[in-house]
A protein has these predicted regions:
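Metal-dependent phosphoester-hydrolase catalytic domains
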Residues: 112, 158-167, 175-276
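A broad, low-specificity signal marking well-ordered, structured residues that form hydrophobic/aromatic
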Residues: 22, 94, 118, 130, ...
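Structured beta-strand-rich core segments of catalytic domains in phosphoester-bond hydrolases
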Residues: 59-137
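Bacterial N-terminal signal peptides
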Residues: 2-11
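Extracytoplasmic, non-cytosolic globular domains
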Residues: 22, 29, 36-54, 59, ...
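Beta-strand initiation motifs
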Residues: 18-22, 78-80, 102-103, 229-230
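N-terminal, active-site-proximal structural segment of metallo-dependent hydrolase catalytic domains
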Residues: 12-76, 88-92, 146-150, 244-274
Length: 276
């Protein structure tokens, strides 16, 4: 697996080739009692990590009106960012992007009633588009998650998304381990093997992303067309070669990710770490 917080995209020109670093992020980092970003812990993490393309879950804020969602995107990322959020659903998925969203939509996940798969075609620098897909798989069982992955794979193939374009599937997979059947199902579309993102410590939990830091719930998976451009995540003086599992309780120095507070990743009902 290549779980990129950053990729380098070559953009050909008449005289010189240019590169653009693009930071990708999967984030189900709501907190509080309403599965929303209202309390602010997740918002500070977004501000501190400064991602370019975000596959977000539980995309709730305020009254969930268009105005409130736009205000959240402005606050967490900036007024120039574009977004697509699925219509309806109690805990909707979405894609947020620094770069123009050319087309976006949702695919019905018949396994669950409160969210769908969300996709966006994004005009990143260079001659290829990037397709970002935001997913939130079930906690109920590995077999149910594999059913969802199979459905998603069929949607992607039917679209179709060109193999020559960039593809990233990111979000909350709720996987108990790195070898679940849903991961194998998606392996024909994206790179699923290690090395994996880490929180930068030597702790045995450093690769895990759930609140208890004992399971790899969250993923950023890219296709082989994109994985060749993978590059380390650079934040301040630190480089995370294989991507970052961000936990404010262990990250140091926090001054590099201001305005994040040390307790943000441990906030009440924050069940996941951000992955970049």
């Amino acid at each position: 697996m290549v779980a990129l917080a950053a990729m380098v995209v070559a953009s050909a020109g008449f005289a010189n080739a240019q590169t653009t670093r693009i930071r990708l992020m999967a984030a189900n980092i709501t907190s509080g009692n309403n599965q929303s970003y209202d309390p602010g812990h997740g918002t500070r993490i977004f501000q501190g990590l400064d991602p370019d393309i975000i596959m977000i879950q539980e995309f709730n804020y305020g009254s969930d009106s268009t105005t409130d969602i736009r205000n959240f995107v402005n606050l967490a990322f900036g007024s120039s960012f574009q977004y697509f959020r699925e219509a309806g659903g109690g805990i909707p998925n979405g894609v947020i992007s620094r770069y123009p969203i050319l087309e976006a939509g949702e695919w019905e996940d018949t396994n669950v009633s409160d969210r769908e798969f969300v996709w966006a075609k994004i005009d990143v620098p260079g001659d290829k588009n990037l397709w970002a897909i935001s997913v939130h798989l079930l906690t109920s069982s590995s077999s149910n998650r594999n059913n969802q992955a199979t459905l998603l794979k069929n949607f992607i193939n039917a679209k179709p998304i060109p193999a020559t374009d960039y593809l990233v599937i990111g979000g909350d997979f709720n996987t108990d381990n790195r070898t679940e059947s849903c991961i194998n199902t998606l392996s024909s579309l994206v790179v699923t093997s290690g090395p994996y993102p880490s929180d930068g410590t030597s702790n045995s939990s450093r690769f895990n992303t759930n609140a208890g830091r004992n399971k790899p719930y969250d993923w950023v998976l890219v296709n082989s067309t994109l994985s060749q451009y993978g590059t380390g995540v650079v934040i301040g003086s630190r480089t995370f070669t294989n991507g970052l599992v961000f936990d404010s309780r262990v990250y140091s120095p926090l001054s590099e990710v201001s305005p994040v507070l040390s307790g943000d990743s441990g906030a009440t009902n924050m069940q996941h770490m951000a992955v970049v």
